[in-house]
């Protein structure tokens, strides 16, 4: 099959609200596709240079890596399921999550995408000292993973893992979705509510045991349609409950940014192996010079564009080219890679907040490339 055609780089707007008259700035809470001036970008670069001029000592950086799981567990113990809003806007941006849904539903739902939603990056944190709590049926993957390379190279290893799964959660499903870094279920449950395909099965995993417990204890958790499990993406001995080439969609929403940059390529390689030919990875994450990056102070920078928050969780701020390189090195083809520059407004305080997010869709080739 021929390679998929690239979607135009100029995106369909999240909403249809554009600031054409500056005098109307405080009439709404958010404005879409806001272009930055050269002066504004220069100011942002200057702030990043300033807050990254003093890096944390290496021993402190190693401490945040080793204890990453504990920091995310603590986060979910404190906030439980009350920190993030359910992401009903996802179906506007990623219709692949509910292919049969009426596209007119929630057309402007991203206006609900509040600062609170992205004030903390979602998901799994770093990947050291994590553990897996899968059912015994997934244990047969351990021996296969132990024999695979411990460290990944720049390019995706050409060989595939040979797997034999007779029965696994969702084995009879016709459409399988995996969300990585599921948190308390703010993506999973909207998918289960919106996508009524009887052949749908949704997997969701998180680095935090506490987060997975929150998903499994939710009254909407239905084990006949969903399987939640603890998973450490960066640990080669942490198994998945499904075989390679079994997934239609992998979702990464504010998750990749929480991983140590040196480990990101290995993570994307690992996830790409799970995709069926024609399957896609859907990503939304922090972009370079987002307000959250500019607000960091000296002494919070770990490495270039990688920071630690006050609670010990970490976050990276991407460029489009960096993400494109990660995905294409994993053998995936670009369908979408765009920047969403959003101007959010606090009308009460007369404040403006410039947000920068990147949204991507990358697809596994549907057949051998000739």
Curated annotation (Swiss-Prot):
Instruction: Using the UniProt record, give the first listed, main subcellular location.
Output: cytoplasm
Binding-site list for S-adenosyl-L-methionine: 72, 76, 181, 206, 232-233, 253
Which UniProt key words apply to this protein?
Answer: Cytoplasm, Methyltransferase, S-adenosyl-L-methionine, Transferase, tRNA processing
Q: Name one GO molecular function term.
A: tRNA (cytidine) methyltransferase activity
Q: Carries keyword Isomerase?
A: no
Q: Which reaction(s) are listed as its catalytic activity?
A: cytidine(32) in tRNA(Thr) + S-adenosyl-L-methionine = N(3)-methylcytidine(32) in tRNA(Thr) + S-adenosyl-L-homocysteine + H(+); cytidine(32) in tRNA(Arg)(CCU) + S-adenosyl-L-methionine = N(3)-methylcytidine(32) in tRNA(Arg)(CCU) + S-adenosyl-L-homocysteine + H(+)
A GO BP entry: tRNA methylation
**Which InterPro entries does the entry mention?**
Methyltransf_12, METTL2/6/8-like, SAM-dependent_MTases_sf
Enzyme Commission number(s) of this protein: 2.1.1.-
Q: What does the UniProt entry say about where the protein is found?
A: Cytoplasm
The record ties this protein, via CDD domains, to: AdoMet_MTases
State a GO cellular component annotated for this protein. cytoplasm
According to its UniProt record, which protein family does this protein belong to? Answer: Belongs to the methyltransferase superfamily. METL family.
On subunit structure and binding partners, the annotation says: Monomer.
Its biological purpose is as follows: S-adenosyl-L-methionine-dependent methyltransferase that mediates N(3)-methylcytidine modification of residue 32 of the tRNA anticodon loop of tRNA(Thr)(UGU) and tRNA(Arg)(CCU). N(3)-methylcytidine methylation by METTL2 requires the N6-threonylcarbamoylation of tRNA (t6A37) by the EKC/KEOPS complex as prerequisite.
The name of this protein is tRNA N(3)-cytidine methyltransferase METTL2
Q: Which organism is it from?
A: Gallus gallus (Chicken)
Taxonomy of the source species = Eukaryota, Metazoa, Chordata, Craniata, Vertebrata
């Amino acid at each position: 099959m021929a390679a998929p055609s690239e979607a135009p780089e100029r995106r369909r707007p999240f909403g249809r609200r554009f600031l054409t008259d500056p005098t109307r700035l405080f009439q709404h809470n958010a404005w879409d596709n806001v272009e930055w001036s050269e002066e504004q970008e220069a100011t942002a670069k200057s702030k990043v240079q300033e807050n990254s001029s003093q890096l944390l000592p290496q021993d402190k950086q190693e401490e945040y890596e080793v204890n990453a799981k504990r920091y995310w567990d603590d986060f979910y113990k404190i906030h439980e399921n009350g920190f993030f809003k359910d992401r009903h806007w996802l179906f506007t941006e990623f219709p692949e999550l509910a292919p049969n849904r009426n596209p007119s539903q929630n057309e402007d739902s991203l206006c609900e995408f509040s600062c609170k939603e992205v004030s903390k990056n979602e998901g799994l944190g770093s990947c050291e000292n994590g553990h897996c709590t899968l059912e015994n049926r997934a244990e047969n993957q351990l021996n296969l993973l132990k024999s695979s390379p411990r460290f990944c190279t720049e390019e995706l290893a050409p060989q595939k893992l040979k797997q034999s799964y007779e029965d696994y959660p969702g084995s009879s499903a016709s459409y399988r979705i995996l969300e990585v870094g599921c948190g308390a279920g703010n993506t999973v449950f909207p998918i289960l509510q919106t996508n009524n395909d009887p052949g749908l099965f949704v997997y969701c995993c998180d680095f935090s045991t506490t987060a997975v417990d929150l998903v499994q204890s939710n009254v909407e958790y239905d084990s006949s349609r969903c399987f939640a499990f603890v998973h450490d993406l960066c640990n080669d001995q942490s198994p998945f409950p499904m075989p390679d080439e079994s997934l239609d969609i992998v979702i990464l929403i504010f998750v990749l940014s929480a991983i140590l940059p040196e480990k990101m390529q290995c993570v994307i390689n690992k996830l790409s192996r799970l995709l069926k030919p024609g399957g896609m990875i859907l990503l939304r994450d922090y972009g370079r010079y987002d307000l959250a990056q500019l607000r960091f102070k000296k002494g919070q920078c770990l490495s270039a564009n990688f920071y630690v928050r006050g609670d010990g969780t970490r976050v990276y701020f991407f460029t489009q080219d960096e993400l494109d390189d990660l995905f294409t090195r994993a053998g995936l083809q670009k369908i979408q890679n765009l920047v969403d520059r959003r101007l959010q407004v606090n009308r009460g305080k007369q404040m403006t907040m410039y947000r920068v997010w990147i949204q991507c869709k990358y697809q596994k080739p549907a057949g051998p490339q000739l």
